[in-house]
Amino acid sequence: MSIKTSNTEFKTRIRQQIEDPIMRKAVANAQQRIGANRQKMVDELGHWEEWRDRASQIRDHVLSNLDAYLYQLSEKVTQNGGHVYFAKTKEDATRYILQVAQSKNARKVVKSKSMVTEEIGVNHVLQDAGIQVIETDLGEYILQLDQDPPSHVVVPAIHKDRHQIRRVLHERLGYDGPETPEAMTLFIRQKIREDFLSAEIGITGCNFAVAETGSVCLVTNEGNARMCTTLPKTHIAVMGMERIAPTFAEVDVLITMLARSAVGARLTGYNTWLTGPREAGHVDGPEEFHLVIVDNGRSDVLASEFRDVLRCIRCGACMNTCPAYRHIGGHGYGSIYPGPIGAVISPLLGGYKDFKDLPYACSLCTACDSVCPVRIPLSKLILRHRRVMAEKGVTTKAEQRAIKMFAYANSHPGLWKVGMMAGAHAASWFINGGKTPIRIGAIGDWMEARDLPEADGESFRSWFKKHQAQEKKNG
């Protein structure tokens, strides 16, 4: 299992998504609603740019001292009675998790929403071993029933409306209740509660780990992560190795930014802090705690010119403002990481072979840059991907030939002049009344909505010479 969610060719995926009116309406409504709520919370907090500066500084500091903080975190978790496993690859991570599950003779695992567990494909590994995995986040639960991948890092089922959700519940679970969010949520809640009470293991992600205390922070709106960590006897937390904060003081800043940027709230409904397994005399918490720290290519990213992307706190704000995401949704990207952040991180974790198109699924409007709470220069990193791909020859043969032809013409002035004159004459033949009969792919659609300037068959160079001579003549 990789971060790739579709084997369909990129252009075909895009066409399918654009032609899906339900998805486009659902995503547009969500973007508008979350964006408006976010702006209210930003205005209420005040000094937002200073908050962004501070959050960015915290993340940069952690990345610059990551080895030290990882060591400190590991020591503290161990002192607290937990187990720590450093996984170099996704295979290492899933192998360890499976070993823990098998050592407990686990038949059922409950799981809260986690992008890193999606990234390493833990569900598939456990299911292949005969262990039932139940997603307990409301959106993820619906997607699991429908065998549909998530399309947003915070709101995984953003692409579905309530009619589709009711259909899924009816077909998979026999739901015959009303088509209201409240009724469907209550139905799912009753189903999941049975799983919470019977699962041997709970698996969660980790929004932030606190190096100073060895604590794990879980941020949710439904409280399901808290159930995953208190009812099962064993809790396994999985984190990307960069998701560390030095102390609770830094976490305070990051959570402030996360809640406002992700869903437009002061705080999410539940902020859970876990520091090791259940202590003697306590009634809540797991008997055993495991922290799996995943590299899976992050060390290479940290050492590269793309290291700024590791600041990401998975808030999804870039998706909530991106015009490309609005039209093609998360599934158009073919990765568990969609949107602008996905256009940067997917090629880094999954390679250019599968994700070479994503850096071009961007208009470079820089809207994502302006909302990122940790100031990741996403548009610059997307451009950087394009440069790297050109240097490595990853681009299409047609593009490579076009660039070579342009470079050759541009380095031969005589040929360039002839080409400009020929182009000027050709433009006058093919443009009439602002329109042209030429229709080539997306250019045809672009020209349908725009009028081209009229061409008189004269190149700028000849026009300039003529006017320069006229000015000299007039003295």
Identify the meaning behind each predicted range.
Residues 139, 182, 267-270, 397-401, ...:
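Short coil/turn segments at secondary-structure boundaries
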Residues 72, 76, 80, 96-100, ...:
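Generic, well-ordered alpha-helical scaffold segments in large soluble proteins
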Residues 281-309, 320, 324-433, 437-439:
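Ferredoxin-type iron-sulfur electron-transfer modules in oxidoreductases and energy-metabolism complexes
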Residues 1-306:
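The feature marks the mature, well-folded catalytic cores of soluble enzymes
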Residues 312:
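Phosphate-binding glycine-rich loops and their immediate beta-loop-alpha structural context
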Residues 215, 249, 275-279, 338, ...:
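Short capping/connector residues at structural and topological boundaries
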Residues 6-34, 44, 407-475:
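Intrinsic disorder at enzyme termini
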